[in-house]
Amino acid sequence: MVLIVGFNLRTSIASFSPICRSLFLFPKYRSRIIRPVVLLEKPFDKHFYATDSNPLITGFPETSKNCPPSVAATKNRLLMNCTEFDDHGNVRVISGDFKKMDLCKQNGLLPRDLRKLNTSINSIVPVILVREGSILINLLHIRALIKANSVLLFDVYGSQHSHSQSQFIYELEGRLKQKSSDFGWLPYEMRALETILVSVVNTLDSELHVLHNLVSDLLADFELDINQERLRTLLIFSKRLSGFLKKATLIRDVLDELLEQDQDLAGMYLTERLKTGKPRDLDKHDEVELLLETYCKQVDEIVQQTDNLVGNIRSTEEICNIMLDANRNSLMLLGLKLSAMTLGLGFGAVVASLYGMNLQNGLENHPYAFYITTGSIFAFAAFLSSLGILKIRRLKRIQMALYHRCNLPISLDPRSLRPPYL
């Protein structure tokens, strides 16, 4: 942030050097220099702070880049970028600015309904709302408003789903341009809804395919070696799979809830309501019910595959924990054995230190005293070490109390578990 002091009106851009004038004419170089401000007040009356997001230079148009942050935020709250398709599938408006109040008035929506489609809010909860004359959908990268003769697609450019939405626009345009007879005489809104569900299922399927390949290769590597890097990678994939499973489960739950609401299913026939002016009977929604059930089963299959993959990861984690516990127990046993051997050697060192005090004990002139004492020390040290190691081995032979109480064989051979009458 740079402190800028206002200039007098006598100072003009023409008085600057050619380099300065070129910098003012090309906005991308303006951030590298100190930008003066032309004010109507007296010089040095006010102080202004100029930033890249709020350039205080007169003569430039007020755009989203040049306007103050508060003004840009207000515009973002009042406007929404949308792409509109007409009843023939042609793009009527590309990334146009629509006022939220106008959208609510034209489509009979409430502000809380439109909030669920707000692209500035990062929401992972999918939504399918059926309103009078429209269907609001928020699934993954698609946020759309379906009517009987138009589709309003809310842009999410700048996010991680921009590429997916760009592909979906071409798919939606192609399907809406086709005749209803090509889709079994489905009305306009059903074709748009089916296109959205196809895109959502394909996105989930492709993401699951990538995760499945990555996780399968990683689990295969665990059979060869377990190291810290692979454990860290397994943790990352486990988090990604958990998030994907939650996302797919929420979509399946939304479709299940919609299938249980007969009133919403009947209200999704927007073309018939527009022509007759009356809502469809509650018991006549076979087409949309079959449509939703088909894609609900596909999403449920994706959820089951993801759940199985998560189960494989958890099984691998449990096996890794068992192997790590076994290695840790082996190290503990080795430490106990070394401690037992150290105890025997320590006893021998104590006896040797007693003889090293240079005191008379009556064995100085005995011809075999040295050999007898040395042999006794080594024998007793070996006895203590062997006794400690035997005690440790007995700890390894402790069996589960279930085998002793039920008189079950300890062997894991399936033939030993057969009943006697077979």
UniProtKB/Swiss-Prot annotation:
Kinase listed as a keyword: no
UniProt entry keywords in alphabetical sequence: Ion transport, Magnesium, Membrane, Mitochondrion, Mitochondrion inner membrane, Transit peptide, Transmembrane, Transmembrane helix, Transport
UniProt-annotated location(s): Mitochondrion inner membrane
Transit peptide interval: 1-49
GO process terms (BP): mitochondrial magnesium ion transmembrane transport
Superkingdom of origin organism: Eukaryota
Pfam families: MRS2-like
One cellular component term from this protein's GO annotations in UniProt: mitochondrial inner membrane
CDD domains for this protein: Mrs2_Mfm1p-like
Name of this protein: Mitochondrial inner membrane magnesium transporter mrs2
Lineage per the UniProt record: Eukaryota, Fungi, Dikarya, Ascomycota, Taphrinomycotina
